[in-house]
């Protein structure tokens, strides 16, 4: 009999709670653990389940989940989705290495460019990236607000080493989330992970900081003459650095990064609450 797959969401904050909640209730033949250092959040999910509030539709979902503190981990996992802030990645990866099966996959769903450091610690063939084009806020213990429409959420995944490895399995796992949310386009595979990373990084660099400082939505920044000029300058600098590194930028949800400010509608309902 085939052993049941074991999946961990390490860093089950806002986005980790959303992803882990859907993965726990999408029909996968897998054991899914949501792991966080936030004791109150973990205990609330243990007692009442993970609550997901969908801002776009007004729906509320309650998902029964396995919730753990890091010190309560005992299993080795086939796939670990890393969803913490990457400032502690060296320590976190060193810790998680002990909980990853020999053929396991560490999938960074973080912002920035985390894969190189992770690969140095756990091995390049075990490292994958997932670029998330959706957002969430933690609004209470055990409760996350999904700020994106479930039908428009996407995750673009790729292998750091360029070899397929467990990419097919990771895609199948995330495709199950697409099925339960009615979003067949939820997960796509890219052969240009670096390009996808740099595209997301450019958006965050150009819009997130300005959004925090001004209180404007991404769409308002793109429409305003002065804010648009600032964002465009930052984007150009990101494009130039990526080009020098030999990176070809990927589209995000079909939007060409080079034409981003000419079509701001995609960002109209987005708002950055934190510097990412």
Task: Show the residue positions of the predicted features.
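NAD(P)+-binding Rossmann beta1-loop-alpha1 motif at the extreme N-terminus of oxidoreductases
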Residues: 2-57
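Nucleotide donor/acceptor-binding cores
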Residues: 5, 78, 153
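A structural signal for isolated positions on well-ordered beta-strands in alpha/beta enzyme cores
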Residues: 8, 31-33, 107, 128, ...
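Short, charged/polar "capping" segments at the starts of alpha-helices
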Residues: 40-44, 115-117, 165-166
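N-terminal glycine-rich dinucleotide-binding loop that anchors FAD/FMN and/or NAD(P) in oxidoreductases
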Residues: 50-67, 204
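Rossmann-like NAD(P)(H) cofactor-binding subdomain of soluble oxidoreductases
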Residues: 59-145
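Internal alpha-helical scaffold of NAD(P)-dependent oxidoreductase catalytic cores
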Residues: 99, 121-126, 143-255
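C-terminal active-site/capping subdomain that shapes the small-molecule cofactor and substrate pocket
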Residues: 249-276
């Amino acid at each position: 009999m085939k052993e049941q797959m074991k999946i961990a969401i390490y860093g089950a904050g806002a986005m980790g709670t959303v992803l882990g909640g859907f993965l726990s209730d999408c029909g996968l033949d897998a054991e899914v653990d949501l792991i966080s250092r936030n004791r109150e959040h973990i205990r609330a999910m243990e007692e009442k389940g993970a609550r997901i509030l969908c801002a776009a539709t007004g729906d509320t979902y309650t998902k029964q989940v396995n919730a753990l503190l890091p010190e309560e981990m005992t299993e080795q996992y086939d796939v670990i989705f890393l969803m913490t802030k990457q400032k502690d990645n060296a320590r976190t990866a060193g810790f998680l290495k002990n909980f990853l099966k020999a053929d396991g996959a560490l999938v960074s769903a973080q912002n920035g460019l985390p894969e190189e450091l992770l690969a140095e610690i756990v091995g390049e063939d075990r490292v994958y990236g997932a670029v998330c084009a959706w957002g969430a806020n933690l609004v209470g213990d055990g409760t996350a607000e999904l700020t994106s429409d479930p039908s428009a959420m996407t995750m673009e995944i790729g292998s750091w080493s360029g070899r397929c490895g467990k990419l097919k399995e990771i895609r199948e796992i995330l495709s199950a989330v697409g099925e339960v949310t009615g979003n067949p386009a939820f997960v796509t595979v890219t052969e240009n992970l670096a390009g996808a990373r740099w595209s997301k990084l450019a958006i965050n660099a150009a819009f997130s900081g300005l959004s925090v400082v001004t209180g404007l939505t991404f769409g308002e920044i793109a429409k305003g003459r002065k804010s648009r000029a600032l964002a465009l300058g930052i984007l150009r600098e990101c494009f130039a650095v990526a080009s020098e590194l030999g990176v070809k930028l990927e589209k995000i949800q079909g939007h060409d990064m080079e034409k981003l400010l000419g079509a701001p509608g995609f960002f109209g309902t987005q708002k950055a609450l934190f510097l990412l």
